[in-house]
Amino acid sequence: MSDTRPQIKTWIEGIHAYVPGKATGAQGQALIKLSANENPLGCSPKALEALDAPGNPATYPDPDAKALRAKLAEVHGLDAGRIVCGTGSDELLNLAAQAFAGPGDEVLFSTYSFSVYDIAARRCGATPVEAPDADYAADVDALLAAVTDKTRVVFVANPNNPTGSFLPRDEIARLHAGLPQDVLFVLDQAYAEYLTPEEDDGGFALAAAHENVLVTRTFSKAYGLAGERIGWATGAPHFIDALNRVRGPFNVTNSGQAAALAGVDDQNFIDRTRDHNTRELTRFTDAMAALGNHGIRPLPSKANFALVLFEGTLAAETALSALADAGYAVRHLPGQGLPHGLRITIGTAEDMDRIARTIAEAAEAAQ
């Protein structure tokens, strides 16, 4: 008997649903959540004050987020007319693929990159194509070699999630220069606020000067506003027009716009966040590197997390269980081809000391 139900499109059937970071253990116990790359310092006091301010939830938000776009343009030296806001940068990444790729097209990204890129490609019926990494970092030569006449979108996260790797300005420029002009280059800068000004990868300048570059950012990481779901992108006017055509008309809430506006106005908080992250990331990766004789290897990271590889007698699953017993949820990544890796968000100094100690004890026990 034939199936008469509405049939899901074949390319949608190929999607593996995004799996968010966990906050509970196997028995349902609450854990300290270091699995989603949230800010351990919370958000700016100014943003919190904006969230607490009375408002009218019966009214629709500004559909164009004009005040927020103007403030972003002021802080980053951009043209507000070349900025669009979204429900997190995830929405904008998906819409970029939807607007510029479809069945018969290819969407290109590195093997160990943000899992949303694969989903974004499949959602619009395009074919996801993975270029091999070089020791868990994006390889410009491999990406360029994977470009075909079917390539329509290239996604690069910089810094990269889940590995923390980073392509410097000259490599980003080389990648862009090697792409055909009719290929959209999406530079996902979700973790850019964790970089120093000297580490700027030149994305904004590329987006301002070229017709095929879109840069996305988010308020979910350094700004500590993950619960409000706010992202933004900048690029050529025809990109902004395309994204405005396909996005929801009221896609950023009143509270989200107010909190983001206040957060952008408090760059001192971003500086404190960066300083905390740099200090604790360095301490933690040093502690993990000291366990190299146990086959434990932290990858270099410019983000707010460390990807720790377990290549010796201590398995990642065993370390994951030990950390849960110690009260922590971190991200195990077998679904992204990293069954031997744990992505660990940088938390407080106390958190990182306890995690390092737990892993060291588990490594000794596994000998």
UniProtKB/Swiss-Prot annotation:
Belongs to the class-II pyridoxal-phosphate-dependent aminotransferase family. Histidinol-phosphate aminotransferase subfamily. Pfam families: Aminotran_1_2. Its EC number is 2.6.1.9. This is Histidinol-phosphate aminotransferase. Keywords: Amino-acid biosynthesis, Aminotransferase, Histidine biosynthesis, Pyridoxal phosphate, Transferase. Homodimer. GO terms for biological process: L-histidine biosynthetic process. HAMAP family: HisC_aminotrans_2. One of its GO terms (molecular function) is pyridoxal phosphate binding. The keyword Transferase applies. It comes from the Bacteria. Its cofactor is pyridoxal 5'-phosphate. InterPro entries: Aminotrans_II_pyridoxalP_BS, Aminotransferase_I/II_large, HisP_aminotrans, HistidinolP_aminotransfase, PyrdxlP-dep_Trfase, PyrdxlP-dep_Trfase_major, PyrdxlP-dep_Trfase_small. The modification N6-(pyridoxal phosphate)lysine is found at residue 221. Pathway: Amino-acid biosynthesis; L-histidine biosynthesis; L-histidine from 5-phospho-alpha-D-ribose 1-diphosphate: step 7/9. CDD domains: AAT_like. The keyword Amino-acid biosynthesis applies. It catalyses: L-histidinol phosphate + 2-oxoglutarate = 3-(imidazol-4-yl)-2-oxopropyl phosphate + L-glutamate.
